[in-house]
Structures are given as structure tokens and as C-alpha cells.
Amino acid sequence: VDAYSSLDAEQSGRALDASLRNLDGEEGDVSDVITPLLDTSAGDGAATEDGQVLDGVTNDTEASDVTDPDEDVLVDVEGEDISATDASLVEEDISQGEEDTTVVEEGWRSALYPTDWFPGFSDNEGRFLHDFSYAGYGNGEVSLPTVSLDEVFDVVADFGADPSGETDATGAIQNAIDEASGAGGGVVFFPEGLFRVDGKLLISASNVVLKGVSPEASRLYFSQSNGMAYLGHIRFLGSPAMGTDLPLSQDGESGSFEVFVEDASSLEVGQDIVIGWVITEAFVAAHDMTGTWEAFNGTWQPFFQREVVSIDMETTPHRVEVDVPLRYLSRVSDSASIRPQNGLLSECGVEDLGLSNAVAWSAAWAQNQVHVLSMENVKDSWIRNVASFPSPLAPTSGNGVGAHLQSSGILVKLSKRVSVVESTLSDAENIGSGGNGYLFEVRQSDEVLFRDCVGKNGRHNFIQNWGFGTTGCVWLRVESEGGTSGLNESFPFGLTGYSEFHHSLATGNLIDSSTFHDGFSIINRGSYSSGAGHTGTENVFWNTGGTGLLRSKQFGWGYVIGTALQLEVELESGLFSGTTDGSSDYLEGYEAAADLSPSSLYEDQLARRLSLEP
């Protein structure tokens, strides 16, 4: 079967042992159970997916009575210690074609990113780094807007919102939003105060910005929990409409800015489009996912949200140039096509606000996937200087004291060119299975930038989730700690919850100059979460620090370049996750992140690209 990446099928074959169980559940994190791994870095005993030791179970004996804490079923754990904390083991396992696992000199550069690097550069084995410089608002080419307060829609002075936090301000705030929307946009301003919101807030127009004085001075807390499953308390929601499907005339090549169709006369320069394809049996088989990937099989899925830059109808077929390169091979045999798109919101923002939505403990655990803020079907928008805070409605004793969030934090979904910067979210109540406790979440979105953000005490503090088509996203200088996979309402404790890529082949993304005291994971999750399978390919860890565990077991090639001394790294095959062909992802600069140059790949690529543009 032909590989979809730039690699041989033999190199890219990544299968999961057929003994994995098939689990059903809800969209997003449907059956978010814990996969056992064979890692003994925590001491004697068998270890689980999160590297936690199960007392009384050793790695040289069969442990048929170990209970999976999320599903109350029995799993088998057997094998040998494969901890990557042993430098000799790392060197032995990475010797299969990977670069530089021994001594790295001060001021070193990656072999895949020389001083004369250019997009498309690769080594003699076809290994390469995507150009990640397009992530963020305006494709990273412009600064975030400076919001003027000369003319605002003041929720207190103009609309009578109560700044004491005693009475419901939902109506007043929504009226301010609606007035701004009707005026073609504007700043909905929150002066100093505490605002109680008993309902939901909806923004469905472009050019609307919610702005406070600071996260400490302007605070909103939300009280509703019933009926909030899979919704956000503040929701920016576009109304996308897809146009006529235009089949590609030839395969769209990874790294190319061009696609070809027979008739491009219905397209216009500046138009939003989506490039996608059908999840065919051949596509599934090429990724060794037959019997695992099932949720989207036979459906057309959006992979790349793009903008038309130019159209050449003098050629046959017609050539369409887009603003950001494709990040994966788009095959005609998979019915790859262009679909024009309208209805995305743009130039929307949230900044300088404190947000919380924690409620009574049992109420929080009764609803799944409640976000405090979501941006769905938007482009060129931002979230800046937002922080969670202890909700006045959080429990005052027992579990949940001082909680900030009911379940989940910020969600960016089906969007492009969004920046989430300088924001902190922490202390979720519901960190159980079913998609909860995701603090910074992205789904089926492209070129999203998470910069200088901190996530604490969620389940998965930073996460890509549910569905194909998360590409070109960057996590720059983010920090995660305290991730925990809670078992249930009565026992909200458990194993380490990693930041991770969670579902369906996130492609060509970058984790850059970031710190994980819990961990980050890109692996084959098999049948978990309704067949998550391979969660990533061609993703890069660059200059990664922290005291947690980095797991990279990607389809095709994944890249780990520059790791800190205290960070554990796990690349080799495992019984229940990762590869089964004995290969490992590319590792370079093990325990040498401090001297990696440049320290940020995204910022260097962006400066390089902008310096070359006229």
C-alpha cells in the first residue's frame, strides 16, 4: 500500500496489537481510558499509560488481574522494562537511522534545520520539518490588534449590568453584544467588577471583542450546569456554508501551494476554501488502521482550511494557489476536493478577562465537556490575557474547594488563523472520562497558535481532539502541570493525565520551547475513544523541557529535537501503544535542549519567511 507521507510503507507502517479492545462512547473523548504501558521509571512494578506503577505487579511476571481504572475491566500487562530514562537504552533504540544521540556540542543545530534551511529541505531518508510559520492570527504576519477604548459598549454604564456579582447580568451583557453586532462590530467593555452570568453568551457576528480591564479586575462567573453538556458559556459561533464540490484533477502534494481542478470559474481570489477527502478503505489501510478507524469512514473530512491567493484558468486543468502549503498528500483516489466556504466569523477577540464556571461538585460531574469559552468556525481571531479564577459557586469544603472550571476551558473548533496567547487556565472539577478537564483544546483546525499559556490541574491540559484535520498548529512556550485522569466523582484521583494529541492523525504540528511537568503524548491509542488510532504524524517536539514524560510514537516519522535533562523520553515500541514494526521516531539532541539553536523553531521560521517576502 502506498504511504501517504513522504516515507516508504515499510518505514511508516505503524500497527497496534489486534488484542486491543473496541470501546464505544460519546464524541470527543468517548471512552478515555488508560492504556497500560511497560514503563518502570517510577520504580518496581508494572506501569500504566501514564507511567504510574501498579503496586505488586512486576514487569517480569504476567499480571492478568490488573484493573483498568476507567473501564473496570481486566487488562494484561507483561513485558520488560522499556523506560527511555536509561541513556544506553535510548542510544540503542534510536540507532535505527536517527541522529545524534550521544554528545552534542554547545550551540548545536538540528541536522534537519541547517543555517541555510528552506521549506522542502530533507535528509537522505526523506525526513523533514514542516514550515510552521503560518500559525496564528493573520498567518503570523501581523501583530494582534490593539483594541481602542474610545468607543465601547459598556456593560455597566450603557446596559446596566450589576458589577457586584449579586444579580444575573446575562441579559445586560447579551444586549451589549447584540448592539455591537448590529453596529457592524465593536468592543463590549467590562469595567472593574464581578459579573454573575446565569445563562449563556452567544456572539454570532464578526468584529466583536469582549474586553475587560485585566483578568483580576474584570471577572465573569457562570452558574449554569444543567443542559450545558457539549456547549460553551461564551460561544463565538460562525455559520459556515459549503459550496459546490470541486474534485482535484491530480494529487495535491504535501508542501505544495497549488491544487488543480477542471473548472475553477466558481472560485474567487480571497475566498475561503476547505481541502479534504473521503476516509476510504484504502486510506485507512494505508495507515494500518483497518478495524480501528471507523467513526469517520466513508465520509468526506476537512483537512486544510485555506484561502485562495490566485487562480490560473489558462492552464489545463485550472491551477488554484492557496495561502498555506498542504501538509499531507491529498489523493484523487480518496476523492480529494475543494469546497468553497462562507460564513466564518473574523476579527473577534476576548482579552483581559477573568472567567470561571465551577459549580457544585456533583453538578459538575453530571455534565460532559462544558467549556467556559469556545471559538467555532472563526478565522483571524484571538484570545489574549484571559485567566480562570476560583468561582464563588465552587464548593467551600470537600472535593472541589477553590475550583475554577466546571470541566473544560477554551475550545477552538473548525477554525483557522487563531491566536490564544498569554492565558492561564486551571483547576477543573470534572476530570473524568467523556471528554472532561481539557483546558486548552483544538479540534479540526489549522494554523492555530497557543503562545505563552499555562494549564494546571486539568485532565489533559493541552489537547488536540476528535476528528481529522488538525494541521499546522503551534504550541509555543506553553507550560503544563498537574494533569490527572480522574476516575469518577467519588474518586477524582488517578493516573497522570498527559497533554496529548488525542484522535485521528493530527498532522504537521509543532510543540515548541514548552515545559511539561506531567507529560505530552503522541501515540497510537488504538480503539480507545471510538477508535482514535494513530493520533499524529510528522509532528515536531522542539526544545522541550520539564520533569514529565514525552512520548512520541507517531505514524511515519515524528520528531523529537532537543530535550531537557530531567525530561523522560519514550520512543520505542510498546505492547499496547506506539509502533509494532520496531522503529522509533527521530531523536536528536537528547538532554541537550539548553544549547539548541534556534531556541524557537516557529519564531525562527517566521522571521526567515518574512525576511524573504517583498
Question: What annotation goes with each model-predicted range?
Answer:
Residues 479-483, 489-496, 507-614:
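Catalytic domains of carbohydrate-active enzymes that cleave complex glycans
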Residues 83-84, 88-191, 196-361, 365, ...:
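Extracellular "leader-to-stem" segments immediately downstream of a signal peptide or signal-anchor
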Residues 1-103:
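Ser/Thr-rich, Pro/Gly/Ala-heavy low-complexity intrinsically disordered linkers and tails
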Residues 185, 198-200, 219-223, 359-364, ...:
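Short glycine/acidic-rich loop motifs that flank beta-strands on beta-rich extracellular proteins
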Residues 182, 189, 202-204, 228, ...:
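Residue-level signal for WD-repeat beta-propeller blades
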Residues 178-181, 207, 216, 336-394, ...:
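Right-handed parallel beta-helix
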